Amino acid sequence: MWILLAYIALIAGINWIYEITPLVTLPGGDLWSPVDIIVGFVFVIRDFAQRRVGHYVLLAMLAGIAISWLTVSKELAFASAAAFAVGELADWAIFTATGKPFSQRILLSSLLGAPLDSLVFLTLVGLASPLAMQVQISSKLGGALLVFYLVWRREKRAAIPRGS
């Protein structure tokens, strides 16, 4: 149950932090939010939550969006809700459809979900540009890749017979 509460809190918390964190100007004048670095972990937490509670994770996503609607600007809440609807549902579908090991499902679902989420979110908040997209997607995937690697190593160690 704690994983669902963590997922809900992350959705609402990320939106609140996004709203109060100043944007960084990138070369060429594009804007980027440092919060993007931690957003990738939300995709991974969703994967852990889905592994634990199945499709109920979608209800947790709706709860996080509802809290965001009450705590941040309506523009940000709408952009976040739309991005979550597209990115997280794609992430959920890939995670559900593949019968691959957990680490691979984390990687595959993030590779699809992060770009979709970024495209929708940045477009709706008026910050979409090629550089901003690249930086946001890279930031999100960085967190997902770190967790993928850690889970993959654990799976690999667990597959090695003791005494070998």
What are these regions (language model features)?
Residues 1-49:
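Hydrophobic transmembrane alpha-helices
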Residues 2-4, 53-63, 101-110:
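Cytoplasmic-side transmembrane-helix entry/capping segments in multi-pass membrane proteins
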Residues 13, 66-67, 94:
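Hydrophobic residues within the alpha-helical transmembrane core of Major Facilitator Superfamily
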Residues 19-27, 70-76, 125-131:
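Helix-coil boundary and interhelical linker segments in multi-pass alpha-helical membrane proteins
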Residues 24, 45, 55, 63, ...:
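Hydrophobic alpha-helical membrane-insertion segments
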Residues 56-88:
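Helix-adjacent hinge/juxtasegments
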Residues 77-163:
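Membrane-embedded alpha-helical hairpins and interfacial helices in multi-pass inner-membrane proteins
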